[in-house]
Amino acid sequence: MKQPIIVVENLYSSYDGKNYVLRNVSFTVNEGELFGILGPNGAGKSTLVLHLNGILKAKRGRVLVSGIDVRKNPREVRKLVGIVFQDPNDQLFCPTVREEVGFGPYNLGVRGKDLEDVVFNSLKLVGMEGYIDREIKSLSFGEKKRVAIAAILAMNPQIVIFDEPFANLDFKGKKLVWDVIKTLRKEGKTVIIVTHEAEYLLECDRILLLANGEVIRVGEPGEVLIPEILKRNNLDVPLIIELFFELGLELPKSLDDAKRVLKSKLKLG
């Protein structure tokens, strides 16, 4: 059985010391797990993510990453946890693609040919190797998002957190993000997807449902992605999930699986 790589215990978080954005949040993420954090806007998802790599420090409770207390050693934790933010403009700050993707590994001591290889291979993984000498400001939103992913992958973190990774992307962009996630899983990385869109979490091993700063439920997709629970917590119920529940079918493991199951049902019908 895989061991927890992230342990969150009784976490409380407040920006002003009075009003809590997170209240008594506790959960674990196992090594190599594809873990989803689901919640409506304002649930506290982004605040929780910032605690997981030490950008924010808990006033009450604690967060452990690979056994390291985030509050005591945030610098070490940031080497282990990479965050791809929802808006790449919040993450990218170097003039060129080459400089942006090379910045992290350079600061970790990678030099010369090794650095060139890391930059090229990270960009290749997101289909951006041909953009290596382009200026960041000349890129589209989707291209910037891919560079932001490459910049995190170049640092080879054990844990990669994607905050709303599918927002404002076309079908091709979403597929590319999924391909990256699948590659990371094959490499044994721990991947966390943070979103308000339930359909993107069908492939997760487990999902945490967060609302109003509190944990509502943690479990496998079939235990969390239940229409009445989603509605109760101000989340849209994807048509595909509603349909499977109405038909009395077990939730599919992916959107592709859902299409295959429904296609076979229609043929039988």
Swiss-Prot record:
EC number(s) on file: 7.-.-.-
A GO molecular-function annotation: ATP hydrolysis activity
SUPFAM superfamilies attached to this UniProt entry: P-loop containing nucleoside triphosphate hydrolases
GO CC, alphabetical: ATP-binding cassette (ABC) transporter complex
This protein's record includes keyword Zinc: no
One Pfam family, short name: ABC_tran
SMART domains per record: AAA
Residue sites binding ATP per the record: G39, P40, N41, G42, A43, G44, K45, S46
Main location: membrane
EC category name: translocase
TM helices/strands, residue ranges: none
Membrane topology: Peripheral membrane protein
Localisation: Cell membrane
Residue span(s) of domain ABC transporter: 6-237
Disulfide bonds: none
Record keywords, A-Z: ATP-binding, Cell membrane, Membrane, Nucleotide-binding, Translocase, Transport
Similarity remark: Belongs to the ABC transporter superfamily.
PANTHER family given in the database record: ENERGY-COUPLING FACTOR TRANSPORTER ATP-BINDING PROTEIN ECFA1, HEAVY METAL TRANSPORTER
Role noted for this protein: Probably part of an ABC transporter complex. Responsible for energy coupling to the transport system.
Protein name: Putative ABC transporter ATP-binding protein PF0528
